[in-house]
Amino acid sequence: MGESNEDIDQMFSTLLGEMDLLTQSLGVDTLPPPDPNPPREEFNYTVGFKDLNESLNALEDQDLDALMADLVADISEAEQRTIQAQKESSQNQDRFALLRASDGQGTASGGYGASAAAIDVSHHEEALPPPPVEPMLDLLPPPPPPPPPELLSKEEEEAKAKADKIKLALEKLKEAKVKKLVVKVHMDDSSTKSLMVDERQLARDVLDNLFEKTHCDCNVDWCLYEIYPELQIERVFEDHENVVEVLSDWTRDTENKVLFLEKEERYAVFKNPQNFYLDNKGKKENKETNEKMNAKNKEYLLEESFCGTSIIVPELEGALYLKEDGKKSWKRRYFLLRASGIYYVPKGKTKTSRDLACFIQFENVNIYYGIQCKMKYKAPTDHCFVLKHPQIQKESQYIKYLCCDDARTLSQWVMGIRIAKYGKTLYDNYQRAVARAGLASRWTNLGTVGTPMPAQPSTVSSGLKTGTSQPNGQMPQAIPSAGPPLQEAQTQIETTKDEKQGLGNHSPGATRENHRPKSSLPPPPPPVRRSSDTCGSPALPSKVKGPGTCTFPHPPENFLPPPPPPPPEEDNSGLLPPPPPPPYLEEPPDFVPPPPPPAAVEDSALPPPPPPPPCLSQEITKSSPLPPKKPLVPPKRQENQGLPGAPGNSEQDFMSDLMKALQKKRGNIP
């Protein structure tokens, strides 16, 4: 081994000499001393790797962990040295680059006074050569580190591989040493959930896992609860407790359980501190003020009690019942709570500190609630608390049982003992629980804020419907006078789109007008029709009788009721086409306006407008100024028009006659 080491040293020294010559020929000032040093150290280090197996075989008695620690330390040192060397080389490169850049800028500024072409040429000449030179000069320092691994690459790779394997093995050993338990947690709904808990997890971490699994509200009252059925005791896990350590104290065949429950008394002191610090004043006034204490005073009281130089323990003292060792008898004694433990007043002594006797200290005990102590141990009441060492899992004389008179006293003593035992840690646990609950509430609020509020489609839809149904498109004023019949007629018009069914009860009149134009006489002009729209229907029957004697060629002026318009053929030849749209618009007002005086018929020869059916029918029924020449048609119309809203068989007969006359007329005209 010695000879091989010397040969390698000679080779490495010759290599370094050649590198020095190269650097001198290039005229670059590198730092030779730092460059050769790291590889030599690495080389010596690799030699140590070769001797590692021999040393391990020779020194089997030595501790493997100590050797591994030394090995890891050597590796880390070598890595740090290589990193430092690389940093130094990079710094040198940066310096060279800055110097060259400054030189280039100086030359460029000096030649700026010359012509533009000369400036460009000089700039290119000065700027272009440096870039190729920079990489060459910059690459020279890095090469020294790579050559040694090339020469000793196999050995170094083997050594590094071994070191990495050892590191992984150590990490796996550490991970394997971590205690892990599968815990079955009982829920308040009698269901269970299994969790994998390791010794690095605290009760707070387990609670967070349960919050994620159960999706509960994450308030501060949720806690892990420990129950001992054999001893009939139970307690709350503190958030800072190690769950695995506590469960490791259980026996293998134990019936103990871990529950996930809400307990309001867990942090009751932080919600109402006055009930624990100011409740034992002995005056009713103080109790009343305690009940009315505001949030600021509560916060001030908590800061004074938990955030000072020392923790203030509630001043609790009073008579409690103590269970005698190995017996079911209880003795009443006067106990006092102090930060170090519980003290009692011996018989015949006073409450002074020198006369007090120590009952128990809180360092190595946990506090539990008693379950059915009155039945099992003949306790005076069921309000009992128990103090025992966590490793005691069966009945023992070292378990202390104390009984209180009421539940309020019990809660005060239990909370006071917890404050004396855990101190400010208890307050820190509460603050973390509040922060966790606040975070959960914010997440839930973010999920609920984006939900759309339900709209009121009924009101909106009703408004839209009324808005569309009330106006008739062309005569909105007829809405109030028409009433429900008009709305029904309008809905029929929208759905069926039939002109004849424009109005519910007056649809037959519209059909009559469509069929009455069979008469060869021309209808009155459009203005007369509009005036007739306003005329009333009751005056029609008296005027209808008059025109019965009139001849066809000369219609009388007083004859209003007879059929108004001629056949559709004559309507097509009519000179006034605009009236058709107004009749539809003027249909509603036919019911309301009074009948105006009949207008004189001047344009008897003019043809009537083509599409007046709904409005014209009502106009004719309301005394149209120009009556038709047919004497037989008016009496039929008088019967039906005298009561426009009353349907009957006469209307059907009249309609059939009109249809027949219209068919004949159409057949004769072509």
From Swiss-Prot:
Intracellular or extracellular location(s): Cell membrane; Cell projection, Lamellipodium; Cell junction, Focal adhesion; Cytoplasm, Cytoskeleton
One Pfam assignment: PH
Protein family membership: Belongs to the MRL family.
Residues bearing the modification Phosphoserine: 55, 532, 537
Record keywords, A-Z: Cell junction, Cell membrane, Cell projection, Cytoplasm, Cytoskeleton, Membrane, Phosphoprotein
Compositionally biased tracts (Pro residues): 553-567, 576-599, 606-615, 625-634
Highest classification ranks of the organism: Eukaryota, Metazoa, Chordata, Craniata, Vertebrata
Domain PH span(s) in chain numbering: 313-422
Domain of life according to the entry: Eukaryota
Organ and tissue specificity: Ubiquitously expressed with high expression in the hematopoietic system.
PTM annotation (Phosphothreonine): residues: 534
Subunit (UniProt): Interacts, through the N-terminal Pro-rich region, with the WW domain of APBB1. Interacts with RAP1A, PFN1, VASP and ENAH.
Cell membrane found in the keyword field: yes
Biased segments, Polar residues type: 456-475
Protein name as it appears in the record: Amyloid beta A4 precursor protein-binding family B member 1-interacting protein
Membrane topology of the entry: Peripheral membrane protein
